[in-house]
Design a protein with these regions (language model features):
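Post-Walker A helix-loop "phosphate-sensing" segment adjacent to the P-loop in P-loop NTPases
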Residues: 73-84, 98, 249
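P-loop NTPase motor domains
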Residues: 1-41, 46, 90-293, 306-309, ...
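C-terminal regions of RecA-like/P-loop NTPase motor modules
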Residues: 1-16, 58-59, 305-387
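Hydrophobic anchor at the beta1->P-loop junction of P-loop NTPases
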Residues: 55
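Short coil/loop residues immediately preceding or within conserved phosphate-binding loops
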Residues: 50
Length: 387
């Protein structure tokens, strides 16, 4: 809930001459303290119209620390919530500390995620194969370029054939892989089928076949970290798509069980560098609310990210945006996008780590968040070399 609290305010607050918003949602998670009133800021994303969020700030501003603190608070306070992280820099030591599963993805990794994994709840109440076929088409386009109608028809037909036994068994048992799909393609009479099979060979039966094998990691752990640090340029575009689809599988499965899912996408701008992962993320971003899921994007590259219309729309429509210390050009972009005044911008100008401005619904609140350095939790969260 939001309350208007009459207090004496400093003139640089920029919030109101004599009122501040007191943010204290029922079952809220600690975000920090109001920089003016010192009141706790407790946020429950399910209370917002759109529970997705962003954490932004320059390197060293404290965004990683804030995200990890949010993860720990969610993990410990809500036993009915699962956490998923995409980690490009291998910075989330808290995964192992909390008994989570780190899935290391690369061309040489022993960990594998099957690109064709599909649970019975994948289809949003409809035939799951319809939605999965769309994903397979996007995956193939990412691998070989734009597809014409003949190619799309062939892939759709072969996808149905590959999944036939799995669907007849009620989505139980052995899930087909891209190797099975390619085998079906090679059995088709059309020239297009043979061309597609050849085009995807490198990623199915060649050196980069890590997503064409059965999943061999625990994707049901309460805390999953997709470690993409070693994924490489060749595999990054397809890897991003497969990881996002794996996350969708978990979200839809959790919805059927009545569980919440919190997804943290570190360096989210990486997803916007590739058309198909950006489109998939945008669709996921719009849909997850009804699935009981919430996505947080973390980035220091606001100006670059906002060159994507998709990213701009997502940021503008987010009800929770945490802004830490910002570069000058990023401050200008944020002010334009969110209507932030010069006075309010002072809270994200040369700000100390953990200090900033947070947009919560229609409120803009200056905040501070400090975690004592003499704690094991701080040491687990810190990304500083000698801490």
């Amino acid at each position: 809930m939001y309350k208007k609290q009459r207090i004496r305010t400093h003139p640089r607050s920029g919030i109101s001459s004599d009122y501040l918003c007191l943010v204290c949602h029922k079952k809220g998670i600690y975000l920090g303290n109001n920089a003016i009133s010192k009141n706790l800021i407790m946020v429950n994303r399910s209370e917002l119209l759109n529970g997705n969020s962003f954490i932004t700030g320059v390197s060293g501003s404290g965004k990683s620390m804030l995200a990890k603190q949010d993860i720990v608070n969610l993990y410990l306070s809500d036993k009915n919530a699962d956490i998923i992280v995409i980690d490009p820099e291998r910075e989330y030591k808290i995964v192992e500390a909390l008994g989570g599963e780190r899935i290391i993805l690369s061309a040489t990794s022993k960990h594998h995620i099957n690109a064709m994994d599909m649970n019975r709840d994948y289809g949003d109440g409809e035939n799951p194969l319809i939605l999965k076929s769309e994903f397979i088409l996007s995956l193939c386009e990412q691998l070989i370029g734009r597809l014409d109608l003949k190619q799309k028809s062939v892939i759709d037909r072969c996808t149905k054939i590959a999944y036939r036994g799995y669907l007849m068994n009620g989505c139980e048992g052995e899930v087909p892989t891209l190797k099975d799909l390619r085998k079906v393609l090679l059995e088709q009479p059309e020239v297009e089928a043979q061309e597609i099979a050849l085009a995807i060979e490198l990623f199915v039966d060649g050196s980069l076949d890590t997503f064409a094998k059965p999943t061999n990691v625990d994707t049901k752990n309460r805390f999953i970290c997709y470690d993409i640090h070693d994924l490489g340029k060749q595999m990054m575009p397809i890897g991003m798509l497969v990881v996002l689809d794996s996350i969708l599988n978990r979200i839809t499965s959790n919805r059927a069980k009545g569980r919440s899912t919190y997804v943290f996408l570190d360096e989210i701008y990486l997803l916007f560098k590739h058309e198909y992962s950006a489109d998939f993320l945008f669709t996921l971003w719009k849909r997850v609310r009804k699935y009981g899921a919430f996505i947080t994007g973390i980035t220091q590259n606001i100006e670059d990210m906002l060159q994507s219309h998709t990213a701009r729309t997502m940021l503008a429509n987010s009800e929770l945006v945490v802004m830490l210390n910002q570069a000058a050009t990023d401050r200008e972009k944020l002010a334009e996008l969110m209507g932030i005044s010069e006075l309010q911008l002072s809270y994200i100008t040369n700000a100390e780590a953990g200090h900033g401005l947070v947009k919560i619904g229609g409120a803009l609140v200056p905040f501070v968040n400090h975690l004592p350095k003499d704690t094991e939790l701080y040491r687990l969260m810190s990304t500083k070399a000698f801490e």
